[in-house]
Regions:
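N-terminal beta1-alpha1-beta2 submodule of the flavodoxin-like/Rossmannoid cofactor-binding fold
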Residues: 1-87, 97, 104, 160-172
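Solvent-exposed loop/turn segments at secondary-structure junctions
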Residues: 11-13, 49-51, 94-98, 124-127, ...
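Short, conserved loop/helix-junction motifs that constitute active-site signature segments
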Residues: 82-83, 108-114, 137-139
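Charged helix-capping and loop-helix junction motifs
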Residues: 102-108
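Short, glycine-/small-residue-rich phosphate/pyrophosphate-handling segment
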Residues: 118-157
Length: 172
């Protein structure tokens, strides 16, 4: 099965394990790279043209403003032709109970009709939020599988859960 792992991740000050920590590599990026290694296929970083604030609280405010206004931030790089892709492992952090707005831009900009979308959401306790419902609404012609919630501060030990989830969905 030809698979694409697409992810949005943020470096900088993040809330993890009950405190603010400085992440040189975002939790979602680490989880996405593990999923991509297990599933094979291409790895694509969903990156906004603009950088999000390094400071956690400032980033939260920007993300709230984007969600409230329905912003669709421009992507720094477009994903290209996905016609040969059968499954998209979509990895993102939970922001404001859903996906960061660049992920919305990605989903709306790709033809995902008939493709399987496997959502994986990093968070510190909020789970998937309403992201799975949002993905179904944005991609009504795709098959959105049951997602996997990964605690960001425990991503280093999430390998077995990620592998089991990918096996359950027949990706590996």
């Amino acid at each position: 099965m030809k698979t694409l792992t697409a992810y949005f991740s943020r470096r900088g000050m993040n809330y993890a394990g009950g405190k603010l920590v400085d992440l040189k590599v975002g939790n979602t990026e680490r989880a996405a790279k593990l999923a991509s290694e297990l599933a094979g296929g291409a790895l694509f970083e969903i990156r906004a043209e603009h950088e999000y604030p390094y400071d956690y609280r400032e980033c939260v405010e920007v993300s709230k403003e984007e969600l409230t206004s329905g912003a669709r931030p421009e992507l720094a790089v477009e994903p290209g032709d996905l016609s040969g892709v059968e499954a998209v492992i979509l990895c993102y952090p939970c922001w404001c109970d859903t996906m960061p707005m660049p992920v919305w831009t990605f989903l709306e900009g790709c033809d995902l009709a008939g493709k399987r979308i496997l959502p994986m959401c990093t968070n510190e306790g909020s789970g998937m939020g309403r992201s799975e419902a949002d993905i179904r609404r944005l991609c009504p012609e795709a098959v959105v599988e049951k997602g996997l919630s990964v605690k960001g501060s425990a991503v280093e030990s999430a390998g077995p859960a990620i592998e089991a989830w990918l096996r359950e969905h027949g990706v590996i």
